[in-house]
Amino acid sequence: MIIKVVLIGDGGVGKTSIARAYLRKEFQYEYMPTIGVDFYKKRIKVHAETLGEIMITWHIWDFSGQPYWKEVRPVFYEGSQGALLVFDISNLNSYRDTLTWAGEFVRNAGKRPIILIGNKIDLRGKVDKCLTYGDGLRMAKNISENFNVDVSYVETSALLRVNIDKAFTELARSIFKCLSVMEIYL
């Protein structure tokens, strides 16, 4: 089964680093903005509540967060079954912008599950004014209520590879809850 998901959020929040960490690639310390969209694949076995173990192939679309690419993004949402919506816990603007990103996702992909990710937790204690876990939970609830979609919250560190697998596993579970058995086997 192929599952298309999108990695969305402002530029510089760590979307590409999350994808690379999930694929077990080396962390890139130098920031290189994504141009348009990057694409990754990964085949894994996941546990679906009603089906047991199932093999899936993630098709991970890593969207550029730069405003310049806003006009072309809608085309890339087509067929998405879920989103990893990322903000940087040390960047309040990226946190606030998650509402805009969630709206864009729901408008273009429909009411699909979203995992809100507070990335760069390795910066807590090193950078002033980091957002808290409670802030992330509040935003997840806000997005869920505003757009009537299933939203969970996970904190990650792409640098330290903390909770990267958990974010994708949570998204898979949420997607399977929404899909019918017919959709899974088509």
Which residues does each PLM region occupy?
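Walker A/P-loop nucleotide-binding motif
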Residues: 11
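ATP-binding glycine-rich phosphate-binding loop
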Residues: 35-36
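Ras-like small GTPase catalytic G-domain
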Residues: 1-8, 17-25, 41-186
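Post-Walker A helix-loop "phosphate-sensing" segment adjacent to the P-loop in P-loop NTPases
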Residues: 24-32
